[in-house]
UniProtKB/Swiss-Prot annotation:
Highest taxon in the source lineage: Eukaryota
Record organism: Homo sapiens
Protein name as annotated: TRAF3-interacting JNK-activating modulator
One GO MF term: molecular adaptor activity
TM stretches of this protein: 527-544
Recorded consequence of changing residue 529 to S: In a colorectal cancer sample; somatic mutation
GO biological process, one term: positive regulation of type I interferon production
């Protein structure tokens, strides 16, 4: 028997190994295959195709080169070799002979496909040779790429006169000088050189685009090659495994033939047939069980399908209900948001109302304190009013007394005036009598004169005394009249103050009643000026009363 390979299978090793180990393994495989001869049929076919492709590209580039420089080649027919066309171009008047420089330039410029294939062969020298099918695919792809290029033997047409470049000579006898342009640094550059540079740049851009396209194609081919190499490796590994199994079976058969005789082999075969029959019966029984289980499973599957259909219907119903509930939830969410916004607004209003309420409560407390102070002041004013009323009563009593005294004085003055008048009348009568006596007694005796003068002197003295008393009484009367006038003025002032205080008290009581009836929010604006006016009036009355009492 063949001993099994102790090494793990390459597939498992590839899955288990790391990236660095994989890179090292691939490098070792490349190094081991580099010395091996690399000559196969598919490589030779690819090489011929690449050579053909290279020649076609070179011819197409030469044609484009001649077209861009507005040169003309002689058409000798399709049967002639293209080298003869290159060696023998037609020379006409007005044309420039074609030099061998374009050909050398075209040969120097290596085709991008050749460069890329060279790099690919350098980068992947140790890869396993792909199968023939992959080579066919590559050959077909390259042939299709080559078919897209312009044909090989297309004749170069003569360009018209108005399309000729700066390298062609004019057909007429006149010779024109080449135009030139001056750069910023003072260097003169010919127009044809600028045109040549632009043509070279366009050609380089076109080559770059072609190279990019070829790189994309090569990347696609590389991915296909990698996949094909992986599949070929897997096939070879499977083939090696099968070969190993066949060898192990052959070894087992060989050992069995050496151990057992033909009769023993028959016995073993009979035993194996019995085992086979028993295994077949067991397999049939197991198959029947499996079929029964399958039937049960199918029945369960049908029942589950029915339940699934019912569940799907219910699911659709629940889905419709869910969508309806979702819409309701959205509407409720919008309503909830609106209510929350309203609630925030109301909370802000409530906070403002609370702050206002606090302010109003503070104002109300302040007003209550002021009300209490005003009530205390009103009580004080009422006491002052009572005192004022008592003072007025005293003053009225004094006024009555003064009026009574005035009346008594008036009566006495009248009496005194009557006495004075009577005395004046008596004096007049006495004077008349004296005049009559003087007329009746012509001789005047000096002895009797002093006796007569004495009564006259006594009468005059009495008159002067009466006059003095009368003047004193009149002065007293005038003083009493002044006092009465002053008392009348004071009484009028006190009555006016009393009436003003009564009016203010009534006004304060009315405002207090209104403040008790109206809400506190409306009273705040009206209370303050009224209270200030009442306080000012009460202070004025109080100060006036103090001044009067001091007087």
């Amino acid at each position: 028997m063949i001993s099994p390979d102790p090494r793990p299978s390459p597939g498992l090793a590839r899955w288990a190994e790391s990236y660095e180990a994989k890179c090292e393994r691939r490098q070792e495989i490349r190094e081991s295959r580099r010395c091996r001869p690399n000559v196969t049929t598919c490589r030779q076919v690819g090489k011929t195709l690449r050579i053909q492709q290279r020649e076609q590209l070179q011819r197409a580039r030469l044609q484009q080169f001649f077209r861009r420089r507005n040169l003309e080649l002689e058409e000798k027919g399709k049967a002639q070799h293209p080298q003869a066309r290159e060696q023998g171009p037609s020379r006409r008047p007005g044309q420039v002979t074609v030099l061998k420089e374009p050909l050398s330039c075209a040969r120097r410029i290596s085709s991008p496909r050749e460069q890329v294939t060279g790099t690919s062969s350098e980068v992947f020298p140790a890869q396993h040779p792909p199968p023939s099918g992959i080579c066919r695919d590559l050959s077909d792809h390259l042939s299709s790429q080559a078919g897209g290029l312009p044909p090989q033997d297309t004749p170069i047409k003569k360009p018209p006169k108005h399309h000729r470049g700066t390298q062609t000579k004019a057909e007429g006898p006149t010779i024109k000088n080449d135009a030139s342009q001056q750069t910023n640094y003072g260097v003169a550059v010919l127009d044809k050189e600028i045109i040549q540079l632009s043509d070279y740049l366009k050609e380089a851009l076109q080559r770059e685009l072609v190279l990019k396209q070829k790189m994309v194609i090569l990347q696609d081919l590389l991915s296909t090659l990698i996949q094909a190499s992986d599949s070929s490796w897997k096939g070879q590994l499977n083939e090696d495994k099968l070969k190993g199994k066949l060898r192990s079976l052959e070894n087992q058969l060989y050992t069995c033939t050496q151990k057992y005789s033909p009769w023993g082999m028959k016995k073993v075969l009979l035993e194996m047939e019995d085992q086979k029959n028993s295994y077949e019966q067991k397999a049939k029984e197991s198959l029947q069980k499996v079929l029964e289980e399958k039937m049960n499973a199918e029945q369960q599957l049908q029942s589950t399908q029915r339940s699934l259909a019912l569940a799907e219907q219910k699911c659709e119903e629940w889905r419709s209900q869910y969508e309806a509930l979702k819409e309701d939830w959205r509407t409720l969410g919008t309503q909830h948001r609106e209510l929350e916004s309203q609630l925030h607004v109301l909370q802000s209003k409530l906070q403002g109302a609370d702050s206002r309420d606090l302010q109003m409560n503070q104002a109300l407390r302040f007003l209550e304190n002021e009300h209490q102070q005003l009530q205390a002041k009103i009580e004080c004013l009422q006491g002052d009013r009572d005192l004022c009323s008592l003072d007025t009563q005293d003053l009225q009593d004094q006024l009555k007394r003064s009026e009574a005294e005035k009346l008594t004085l008036v009566t006495r003055v009248q009496q005194l005036q009557g006495l004075l008048q009577n005395q004046s009348l008596q004096l007049q009568e006495q004077e008349k009598l004296l005049t009559k006596k003087d007329q009746a007694l012509p001789v005047w005796s000096p002895k009797s004169f002093p006796n007569e003068v004495e009564p006259e002197g006594t009468g005059k003295e009495k008159d002067w005394d009466l006059r003095d008393q009368l003047q004193k009484k009149t002065l007293q009367l005038q003083a009493k009249e002044k006092e009465c006038r002053e008392l009348h003025s004071e009484l009028d002032n006190l009555s006016d103050e009393y009436l003003s205080c009564l009016r203010k008290l009534q006004h304060c009581r009315e405002e207090l009643n209104q403040s008790q009836q109206l809400p506190p929010r409306r009273q705040c604006g009206r209370w303050l000026p009224v209270l200030m006016v009442v306080i000012a009036a009460a202070l004025a009355v109080f100060l006036a009363n103090k001044d009067n009492l001091m007087i």
